[in-house]
Amino acid sequence: MPELPEVEVVRRGLEEHLSDGVIHDVDVRHPRAVRAQPGGAAELVALLDGARIQSIERRGKYMWLVLNNGRALFVHLGMSGQMLIHEASDPALPTTHVRISARVDVGEKDLVLSFVDQRTFGQWQVTPVVADPHGGFTGVPVPVAHIAPDPFEAVFDPAVVARRLRAKKTDVKRAILDQTLVSGIGNIYADEALWAAGVAPSRRTRGMRQRDAVAVLEQAGAVMRRALAQGGTSFDSLYVNVNGASGYFARSLNAYGRAGKPCPRCGEPIVRVQWTNRSSHFCPQCQSS
């Protein structure tokens, strides 16, 4: 699943091309793409037709388009979702795995927004907007209301979140993947943040020093900012920005995906272990447990 930097790259692309655009001619081509919409495809089409895009926002891995009808188009990219933008006259309009398409008029431009999703885990949902319980936004879509602020937000306080983290009875990697504690961090950036902070993923949160917990959270933000500057992390063709280009932060990873290779800090081979239904990558020498 795309993590914060990858979703932010997409959000910025949508903001650049679609801000103040008017949506029409919405075509839902796969029912799973609107499975959370109470009234299905017909309702989503009716709520989007003629709506103007006021802004494009993001919290953690979740993105939404603020509409002028008091609602928001919530976009979940799932494992393989892509939001691709083309001129309506472009002969290279995508045709494979397009689950939803929409025309968007932006000034004199006639654009097509295609939601391409090979694995069909992603979705669109037009939803009411509710007050943000964390105060970062004027309002958030209903599916985002329970999601915690991410490290890029002004309302995110590493010291406060660190205290909550230390109150949990779990391991630190599981804690920072909890989207109700801190959002936006997935498996890749969890491994990278823990490596950067010198903390083993198995370290128990109870008994953790405050400064170590803060360091993990601060490093998560720092790592994701570096990833954002490089367009995110792409291991295959499924993650791309709105123009179809891939990010290249994979070349800068220190732990994730580097099993058996020397730790950039101490030279000890990076270890890969099974962790729940995923993998953890860490240095057994310089990440303390």
UniProtKB/Swiss-Prot annotation:
Its EC number is 3.2.2.23, 4.2.99.18. It catalyses: Hydrolysis of DNA containing ring-opened 7-methylguanine residues, releasing 2,6-diamino-4-hydroxy-5-(N-methyl)formamidopyrimidine; 2'-deoxyribonucleotide-(2'-deoxyribose 5'-phosphate)-2'-deoxyribonucleotide-DNA = a 3'-end 2'-deoxyribonucleotide-(2,3-dehydro-2,3-deoxyribose 5'-phosphate)-DNA + a 5'-end 5'-phospho-2'-deoxyribonucleoside-DNA + H(+). Transmembrane segments: none annotated. The keyword Cytoplasm does not apply. Keywords: DNA damage, DNA repair, DNA-binding, Glycosidase, Hydrolase, Lyase, Metal-binding, Multifunctional enzyme, Zinc, Zinc-finger. Binds 1 zinc ion per subunit. CDD domains: EcFpg-like_N (cd08966). DNA binds at residues 97, 119, 168. A zinc finger (FPG-type) spans 254-288. Coiled coil: none annotated. One of its GO terms (biological process) is base-excision repair. Its cofactor is Zn(2+). The active site is at 2 (schiff-base intermediate with dna), 3 (proton donor), 61 (proton donor), 278 (proton donor). Pfam families: Fapy_DNA_glyco, H2TH, zf-FPG_IleRS. Involved in base excision repair of DNA damaged by oxidation or by mutagenic agents. Acts as a DNA glycosylase that recognizes and removes damaged bases. Has a preference for oxidized purines, such as 7,8-dihydro-8-oxoguanine (8-oxoG). Has AP (apurinic/apyrimidinic) lyase activity and introduces nicks in the DNA strand. Cleaves the DNA backbone by beta-delta elimination to generate a single-strand break at the site of the removed base with both 3'- and 5'-phosphates. Belongs to the FPG family. Monomer. This is Formamidopyrimidine-DNA glycosylase.
